[in-house]
Every structure is written in C-alpha cells, then in structure tokens.
C-alpha cells in the first residue's frame, strides 16, 4: 500500500491521504529509518493545529494491524484547518516524548543489519508515510502489544516532517547463549583410544614404554640365545602342547620337563635362579591343570623381575625365557628359517593376543574352562556307560537268563569304572 501526501499553503498543516490498493503486490519491507530533523516552528502562526475527530477515526482505520485498506479507488480524506483547536501542555510534552522514543528506535534500527530485518519479518504490514503527523504509541513494555493497540494521531505545529511508521522488530537471540553453546561445542572432543586393542596389527600398534621394554627384552633373549636352535619338529610339538590343553599334563608342566631335561636353570619362587629337579609322571598328574598364571609359581615371573635379573646376571633372563609360558610363541614368531614373513606377522599378532590375555587373566580362565569341559565329557561318558550297565542289570534280574548275565559281565569287564572284586561278586551272586 502506498500513501501519497499533499500539502496546503500558508503554513497551515493540511493532510491529504491517498490510499492506493494494489492487489497481488507483496508486502513492502522497511529500510533503515530516515533521519529526522526538527525545525523551529514559525512565529507567524502561533496557533497550533489539531486534527478533527473525523480525520482521527479515518487514520485509526488505516493504522490497524495487517493494513486494512479503505477502498480500491482513490479517496481524499478532506482538509482540516483546525483554527480553533490547540494542543494542551500535556499533549505537547507527550508528543516530545514520542519524538525522542522514535529517535531511539531509529538508532537501534541502524545497528541491526538489513538482512536480519528481512529474515526476521518475512511478512510486514503495509508501510504508512505521513507528513506533520505524530503517532501516539502505548507503553513499550511488550513489543507485540505496541502494534496491536490502535494508535491515535496528532498534528504538531512545525514544518512538515517525515515519519516512517514500522512495526517493532523482535529482539534477536542473545549472543551470550549462542557463544556459550559454541564454546561448549568447541570444548567437547570425542574420547579417543578408549578401549585397549587385544591384538593390534604389528605396523599400527602403539606400545607404551613398559611394553616396548618387555618386547625389547624378549627379542634380545630370543636372538642372543646360545646353542643350536630347535628343529622343526620341536616347535611344532610345543605348539601342539599350547594349543591342546585337553591332554592330561598341563602345558606348564611340559615346559618344565623340557627345561629340566635340557639342564637349564630356572627361576624359583623367591626370584633366585635354581636348577629344577626331575618331575615324575605322578607329580605331573597330581599337579594343578594351570600354574602359569599363579603369582607364587616358579613359572610366572613379572616384568619388573625380568628387568632386574637382566641387569644383575646374564643367565637369569635366559632361564626366564625358557620357563616363561610364552616362550614357545616367541620362538615360533622369531624363526625366519621355518616361517615366511607373512606367517611371522600372524604369529606375532598371536603372541600379542596371548600376552594381553595372560596379563588380564583371561588365559587362565580359558584353560581352566577347557579342562573342566574335558573332565565333564569324560564324566558324561562314564555316566552313560553306567546307565547302560544298570539297564542291562535290570533286564538280567527280571529274565534270570544266563545270556543277559554274560553280556553284563562282558560290559563290566570292558569298562574301567568297576574293579575286579565287583566283577567277582556279580559272578558269584547272579540272583542278586
């Protein structure tokens, strides 16, 4: 909507509002507020003019929200000389206050960029351009209600001044909250390397100083080990011992026997090197299924003990390398004559996994679980055989046939669960 103004002569402020309604025209958006220039009123016309009641009602209709249009055709609002009406002192002071308020709004509007006004208010009501007219606005407590209330218009006795009435712009989002959110987003970093790698790739693994020292000691022990290297059958045998814990003797006892047969000194519980005595088969059978993870075992030696013995005597790290449960894996990983480079990498990764499992205690749990599974399977087989023999005994008791007793006796003879005295008792008393 566009408002055209015309001015009458001889210092009398006359208003002529011409309203042109153009259909399907987008709502105009406001630029920055124009600079206001207050001029000294003329001395020749001391009387102040005011608007007539009919003129005020028309202007109220024009200033309603969403720009209510009066008519489609051009309309003249008439003239108003206002010769007998003057502004009171209270109204004059109020008009000055409103001028200062408009000046403050003009400065605030200059600070805001033009893009903010375009994006914040995509649909603005029509713009009203007036000359020598002051809008009486309500209290500026709420910005939304200040435009919904119908304003009143007053004519001031001054030179024609240009005012642009615009709806209040909503206050932008406080920059403090946005800055705090941005700072929080900048300070937040994802947790890197939260979980340890069980078996990292040799080229990508990251070891700390202790792990690097331990690996360096093991490499030095394996490379500087005197004497002829083991043949291809010996590491294969040792690998079978480590991979199959279902055998009666544990892998630690196998390694202990090998070290005893070769006459290599090993570490005792107190940390001093000593020579192991030959272990008989009965002691090996009565020994616990896993001794490599116990802290008081001669086979288990901590990393600090290995470092201390390496600095004190040259033979103690050698014995620790033989008695360590990981010696076979280290030997398999560092035998270039037997394995190719690709298989060495695989075995090195297997060694890393074995070391981590041994330190965390999972290796001990796994070996104990496998041993319990083996014992459970053996016990289950014995229970099945006992059930079968019980069924045969019930049938022989009911039928009292010599063939059933002979079959039961053959089953008991082939089984290892009963002794010979029990067989003699069953044969002597067939009617039991």
From Swiss-Prot:
**Disordered: annotated segments:** 71-98, 194-315, 408-432
Annotated source species? Mus musculus (Mouse)
Protein localization: Nucleus; Cytoplasm, Cytosol
Q: How does it assemble?
A: Interacts with CLOCK. Forms a ternary complex with the CLOCK-BMAL1 heterodimer. Interacts with CAD and HSPA5.
GO CC annotations, alphabetized:
cytosol; nucleolus; nucleoplasm; nucleus
From the UniProt annotation, give the residues forming the signal peptide: none
PANTHER family, per this entry?
Answer: CLOCK-INTERACTING PACEMAKER
Task: Report the protein's function.
Answer: Transcriptional repressor which may act as a negative-feedback regulator of CLOCK-BMAL1 transcriptional activity in the circadian-clock mechanism. May stimulate BMAL1-dependent phosphorylation of CLOCK. However, the physiological relevance of these observations is unsure, since experiments in knockout mice showed that CIPC is not critially required for basic circadian clock.
Name listed for the protein in its UniProt record: CLOCK-interacting pacemaker
